[in-house]
């Protein structure tokens, strides 16, 4: 498995066992090199893949717990554990120190193929959790949004059912270059604000490893007409927060994330995009 390049970060993989090669048609395969349009160096994040027997015990303070994954903390250390329902031992455990440039991921025997190759632990939810922490430090955000370039870089934010896939297909038909129809990264980079495609597509299956300067953020609203409605900064925050991947379970990092989002909204024009299925605009 080669390195992963997502949102201006290069996840440099170090493994003690051979890695399983993903099929070429998987979205993540396109993210094995820097994004097209990159205007600055990426920040390296070292990922060490180690056997589960070497993992440390859970930390003393629980931040989040569900039947599938949990996070504990001890000072600046964070520990994520992923396990299946009813499983005696975790699939994997990830541990990192804040602010982090390295994460140790400890894999269980169930993550190995019959040939002894390691299936990538850098998949949901670990990949997005790590990015939430990296982006909080960088002043950026992982958004539930479509995004791409027509007359400028634009983000189209909205929860499930808001019309991101519908709008993406329409914009593609109009010749717009789309980076994603479901998840977009917005962050300060190369002296400005940029949007990045991600390897997590929606129903339109758009997951392009591309980036571009950000010109505008739209909040999607299905309508019987097509118009762009200006959005006041205070209202924009309440509209866009539900479209953001935020570490609600980790208050200090959440505060960092919200400060970054507020700066983004101060620097980039934003509006409500009313649209119909028959037409779209940028």
What are these regions (language model features)?
Residues 167-168:
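Post-Walker A alpha-helix
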Residues 162-164:
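Conserved glycine(s) of the Walker
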Residues 1-160, 173-177, 184-282:
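A noncatalytic interaction/capping subdomain that flanks phosphate/NTP-handling catalytic cores
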